[in-house]
Swiss-Prot record:
Lyase recorded as keyword: yes
Reported function: Catalyzes the conversion of 2-hydroxypentadienoic acid (enolic form of 2-oxopent-4-enoate) to 4-hydroxy-2-ketopentanoic acid.
Protein name, as recorded: 2-keto-4-pentenoate hydratase
Cofactor(s) the record lists: a divalent metal cation
One Gene Ontology cellular component annotation held by this UniProt entry: cytoplasm
Catalytic activity, reaction form: (S)-4-hydroxy-2-oxopentanoate = (2Z)-2-hydroxypenta-2,4-dienoate + H2O
Organism of provenance: Paraburkholderia xenovorans (strain LB400)
Transmembrane segments: none
Amino acid sequence: MTPQQREEAAQSLYQAMQSGKPIAPLRDTFPDMNVDDAYAIQSINTQRRISLGRRVVGRKIGLTSVVVQQQLGVDEPDFGALFDDMSFGDAETIPLSILHQPKVEAEIGFVLGRDLDTEQPTHQEVLQAVDYVVPALEIVGSRIADWNIKFVDTVADNASSGVYVLGSTPISPRGLDLSLVGMCLSRRGEPVSTGAGAACLGTPLNAVVWLARTMSRLGKPLRAGELILSGALGPMVAVKPGDVFECHINGVGSVRTEFESNQMNGVAA
């Protein structure tokens, strides 16, 4: 892709985000698009948001679950930026007007207590850098019509980011085997998605290690205070107006969210 084409792709995604009207897959509009192009497009819109006063508070890792990879037809993780205005409190109601074809994923949030700026951080170094973990719900969204995405589409679209909710009781990850934690996501008390830490690259810690190494290689190391969302521990679930979701992760805790009952982007009440 030419620099102008990258700008055009970024603008089309941004307009879709603002209008709530999804667009055709970028891979169809720009057949020569590759992964480097996709991350460049993501970066253009990240800088656009920063210029408008938004602040990057961390990173999200996507496509870490084999189940989710199968759902979307991809075979490797990706990452996107988390902004300060994406955060909602535990049990807070989320307005539907800001969402784009939303789906819920149960994850683990890692908050760093120190920088991870070595070139190839080890698992132990990453674990020691984590201040605490919390259960998290990520409400992913797509600006691509009907979630018709391949890897380059979701990467360009900030890893299909939306908003997120963190649990209110932080705990230390040291002494926890995060590969063994079980997860149950319920809609109004009925289980709709189950999984375990092992579904996330073998353990959510592996996902954070992957991200730390990737960001160091890109010259953008993870910093103290940043939030890292691990990626899904089980299948994602489509949101309906008025839904109430609660996630429980054994040994980590619970987190809850609910959605407005009126119409939202891409879904009719």
